[in-house]
């Protein structure tokens, strides 16, 4: 990290003042902690909503992008919450409507590899508000009422910013050729809930891999086997 900041010409500034940070921003990336409580079985998301409230009070036209790990359905629930909140507020002058501009773009950072994984991302995923089936009509109606204009375009612009800041990947794999225009970084756009689910299912799959190989190690110990030899042999299967 020190080498990167020392050698790269970067236009960065830092502040602890949220008002000055948000007032002229086109995009506000929210990466607040959302600690999971296994006893209560929920994510503590109040830090995210604290940031959202401040952004809306300072720069309501900014597009907010949540990066934090959140439960599936959380972003759409925020559209419902703020649609209800907006109806109780004083109308804006000249008949203008209050807008809520929220996207979700999960991060896939490994421990101690955050800078590398930002420069060489495995994929970029951006979720934006899309209409769902009739059973989700309350959410759909809230989105219709308050979503900002051109949210899909806002998602595409944000992805371009991430690509611009990345170093990019190599095109050794012919499958990656389709992503040539995005520096060979797979870039996907989808609904908010789908993007939230991608993050959680990826985490779950990685946890299952760890659990599986822990079981393998336990079995090898009981049977007097060399676990590393087994893992090496299993891992050579291209499907694994």
Regions found by a protein language model. Give the residues of each.
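Structural/interface elements that position substrates and couple domains in central-metabolism enzymes
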Residues: 1-240
């Amino acid at each position: 990290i020190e080498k990167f900041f020392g050698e790269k010409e970067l236009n960065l500034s830092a502040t602890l003042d949220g008002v000055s940070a948000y007032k002229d921003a086109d995009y506000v990336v929210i990466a607040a902690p959302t600690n999971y409580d296994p006893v209560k079985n929920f994510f503590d998301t109040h830090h995210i909503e604290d940031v959202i409230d401040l952004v809306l009070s300072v720069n309501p036209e900014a597009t907010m992008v949540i990066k934090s790990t959140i439960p599936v359905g959380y972003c759409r629930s925020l559209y419902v919450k703020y649609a209800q909140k907006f109806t109780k507020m004083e109308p804006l002058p000249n008949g203008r409507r209050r807008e809520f501009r929220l996207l979700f773009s999960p991060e896939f950072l490994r421990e101690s590899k955050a800078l590398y994984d930002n420069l060489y991302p495995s994929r970029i995923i951006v979720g934006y508000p899309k209409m769902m089936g009739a059973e989700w009509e309350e959410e759909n109606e809230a989105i219709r009422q308050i979503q900002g204009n051109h949210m899909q375009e806002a998602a595409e612009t944000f992805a371009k910013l991430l690509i611009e800041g990345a170093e990019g990947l190599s095109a050794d794999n012919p499958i990656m050729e389709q992503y040539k225009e995005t520096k060979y970084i797979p870039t996907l756009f989808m609904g908010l809930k789908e993007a939230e689910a991608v993050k959680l299912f990826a985490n779950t799959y990685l946890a299952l891999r760890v659990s599986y190989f822990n079981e393998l190690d336990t079995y090898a110990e009981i049977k007097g086997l060399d676990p590393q030899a087994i893992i090496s042999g299993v891992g050579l299967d291209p499907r694994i």
